[in-house]
Structure formats: C-alpha cells, structure tokens
Amino acid sequence: MTTAVIKDHASQKRRNFISKFLIYFFLIVITACMLLPFLWMLSSSFKLNKDVFGFPIQWIPQNPRWQNYVDIWTQIPLLTFVKNTVKITVVVTLLQLFTSSFAAYAFAKMQFKGKNVLFLGYIATIAVPWQAYMVPQFMMMSSWHLNNTHLAIMCLQAFSAFGVFLMKQFYEGVPSELCEAARIDGLSEYGIWWHIMLPLSLPALSTLTIFTFVNTWNDFLGPLIYLT
C-alpha cells in the first residue's frame, strides 16, 4: 500500500514537472518572439542605412557604428523633439485626469435629468474612428488660429470618453453614504470630489495615467496634422 502511494506521488510530481516545463518553455518562446523586433532595432542602430535591411540579417554588426548615437543628437534637433513630446504628454495626461474624474463623478454620484442618455451618447463616441472627424477638427483648429501650436493638441486631447467610463465604473463602487454624510456636514459637490472621491480613486487614476501617457506619447498622426 505504501509503495503504491509513493509511486503515485512520484508519478504526480513527474507530471507536474513536465506540465510546468512545457508552460515555461512556451512562455520563453513567446517572449523571445516579442523581443526579436527590439533586438533587431538595437542591432540596426549600429549599422549604416544600406545595411539595415540586408538579408540574411546580421544580428551582430561586424563594424558597429557608434557615431550613429552622436549623429542623432547633432544632425536633427532631437532634444527639442523630446522636450515638446514630454510637454504635450504631461499636460494632456493631467487634463484628462481632471476632466475625466470630474465628469465621472457627476455621472456616478449626482442626479440630473437626462444623465443616462448623455452618458451613453458620450460613450458612443468611442465607436467613431478618429479618421472620420480629423478633417473637421483640423478646420476647427484653423478657424481658431491654433494650428502649428501645442495648444491645438492639448485642447483636442483634453477630454476622453474612455477615461470618463473608466472613472465612472470605479466611482460607482464607492458607497454613496460617504457622499451623503459629506453633504450633511456641509461639503459642496466640488469638495466631495476633491476631498473624498479623488483620494479613494488613486488606483483608477493610476490606470488612466498609464493609458493616457502611453497613447499621447505614441501619437504620431495628430502632431503630423496639427503641427505641420
């Protein structure tokens, strides 16, 4: 009996080891496939232009060209590009955090006529592709004489339907009794939002910060249209 139990235990350990090995092997392969483009990019940064798309791929350049990392700072105003990107990204992120959390509080904790219809209409704009209204936006910015200014991008990206939806879902999980108690104590709606809802919503704000920061930083078509 004892021998059978020991054999079953050993067999179970062997099966667990094999299953874990296969899982980790699969994950390592997937990770390697995801890292390949970054490795190719790093390798290409040390090559001449004519060697970048050579075939077969030379992963380790025979004559690494370190001068490329000097030229990128001297031949184009890269530092200016980075400063502008950081400026726009930080401002847009802060604006979206403010507008999204503020609007979400109204939709989640306040009662007013047509609230649900207005919320659904606003969220429905997520389904409209940006390409459908980028030309009207460009014309609007032109009429306001904001083209070729950072303010154009900041104004257009200061509001986010996704951000409002995300924050509203979080605020609905906060007990309404907290807001009612604050109102009884004489706190205004602005005070409730600032002193109660914002401190409680740091996890949701952190998530929205990451999404907004990455999307704004990676935006290429917007600056190409409004800043050139």
Q: How would you describe each model-predicted region?
A:
Residues 4-5, 11-15, 19-228:
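A structural signal for multi-pass alpha-helical bundles of membrane permease subunits
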